[in-house]
From Swiss-Prot:
Protein name: DNA polymerase IV 1
Active site (UniProt): E108
Localisation: Cytoplasm
Binding site for Mg(2+): D11, D107
Keyword annotations from UniProtKB, A to Z: Cytoplasm, DNA damage, DNA repair, DNA replication, DNA-binding, DNA-directed DNA polymerase, Magnesium, Metal-binding, Mutator protein, Nucleotidyltransferase, Transferase
GO biological process terms on file: DNA-templated DNA replication; error-prone translesion synthesis; SOS response
UniProt remark on cofactor binding: Binds 2 magnesium ions per subunit.
Length: 413
């Protein structure tokens, strides 16, 4: 690999399904899918085995549609305790080779093995890690090897299952630039049409575009993606990164202490909206909601609720926050309110028992929210909003953003 960094991206193959097959070997070689709401057939496929994918069963499609494509499909409800346990074992193994391991999600992570490879060739090291995970846990993975995180991520996607791919900077014109723009890590599915509208059909098109023009069209993300497309990514492998987003929270100090229920409900609604937007931007869902109330005498209380299914939508967050507030409020004037989504999980591993009767409605809501969020992100202020949110933007403009590292966010006075 020459001088410089050597980064691995370790990506487990069809992780949930693979864990289920390791737990029950009789499932191996069969078409299986992990899905929510298996019994009533109205759930969504979270992941599927490669045998099921060969029949067209891919996430996220409704269970009924998956069964139509593959009648012999074996449906398994998610067991997140089992998946978390397997994930912990995988990352413990990776940390045997280097302390520089960054957990991206439950089934993928980066390793900086620059020091480790002084003793062993990168390919041999990757083979050893891959074979150990398979032998000790019966779980397949693919590994990308590159001089930075972006190229390592792209490399790990090039050969699945059980692939090992090296991607050097000198190879990107040949191996990367011809790929369609939708295969580039960092470009969301809903953004693809926008890029194509500007004749950016391949990663190479993006790499050759003018950075200033990209910033004008796509905001600060344009030049960043331009660098990635040219193989430039200076981000370090950060073992602490996983702790940065244990929670996503917002709070606001009210203009004056109040007991006005309508006003307080409006504030909770806007805080829930803010948390939703930030969770969406970070591509996470939460398994719990916490409410913070600070009274006029500065006494602060917190109440929280763990959820059976992860949530991200504003209305879902608001419903839980409102319920917590009604249970906790003692009637005294309130000075501050805060809403936090905690125990977060990457959105691709979150599943909802989606009601198919509301499927089209939810898709429309998601598309509208995406459009509004992109405008806010670009211009830095709420120039567009849904009707019932408009006045709230004016009133709750001192919102404070908090994460698990903002230790004084919920400090009790």
């Amino acid at each position: 690999m020459g001088k410089g960094r050597v980064i691995f991206h370790v990506d487990m193959n069809s992780f949930y399904a693979s864990v289920e097959m390791a737990y029950d070997p009789s499932l191996k070689g069969k078409a299986i899918a992990v899905a929510g709401s298996v019994k009533d057939r109205r759930g969504i496929v979270v992941t599927s085995s490669y045998e099921a994918r060969a029949k067209g069963v891919r996430s996220p499609i409704p269970v009924w549609q998956a069964l139509r494509k593959c009648p012999e499909l074996i449906l398994i409800p998610p067991n997140f305790d089992r998946y978390r346990s397997a994930s912990q074992k995988i990352f413990s193994l990776l940390e045997e080779y280097t302390p520089l391991v960054e957990k991206v999600s439950i089934d993928e992570g980066y390793m900086d093995v620059t020091t480790t490879i002084k003793k062993v060739h990168p390919l041999e090291l990757a083979k050893e890690i891959q074979q150990r995970i398979l032998a000790e846990m019966d779980l397949p993975c693919s590994i990308g090897i590159a001089p930075n995180k972006f190229l390592a991520k792209m490399a790990s996607d090039m050969k699945k299952p059980l692939g090992i791919t090296v991607l050097r900077k000198r190879d990107i014109a040949e191996k990367l630039w011809s790929l369609p723009i939708e295969e580039m890590y960092g470009i969301g599915r809903r953004s693809v049409d926008t890029y194509k509208k500007y004749q950016l059909h391949t990663i190479g098109d993006l790499a050759k575009a003018d950075p200033a023009w990209l910033e004008k069209k796509f905001g600060i993300n344009g030049p960043r993606l331009h660098c990635r497309a040219n193989g430039i990514d200076e981000r370090p492998v950060d073992p602490e990164a996983v702790f940065h987003f244990k929670s996503v929270g917002n709070s606001t100090t009210l203009p004056e202490d109040t007991t006005n229920e309508g006003r307080l409900t409006d504030v909770l609604h806007q805080l829930s909206h803010s948390v939703h937007v930030r969770m969406k931007r970070k591509h996470v869902f939460c398994y719990g909601v916490q409410l913070t109330i600070r009274y006029d005498d500065r006494k602060t209380i917190t109440r929280s609720r763990k959820l059976e299914h992860p949530i991200q939508e504003k209305d879902d967050i608001f419903t839980v926050a409102l319920s917590l507030w009604k249970q906790a409020w003692n009637g005294r004037p309130i000075r501050l309110l805060g809403v936090t989504g905690y125990d977060v999980i990457d959105k691709k591993y979150a599943y909802e028992p989606l009601d198919l009767f509301r499927y089209e409605e939810q898709i429309k809501q998601a598309t509208l929210a995406e459009t509004i969020s992109s405008i806010h992100k670009r211009y830095g202020k709420p120039i567009v909003a849904k009707g019932k949110d408009l006045d709230l933007f004016k009133e709750v403009d001192e919102t404070k953003k908090g994460t698990s590292f903002d230790r004084d966010f919920f400090q009790h006075d």
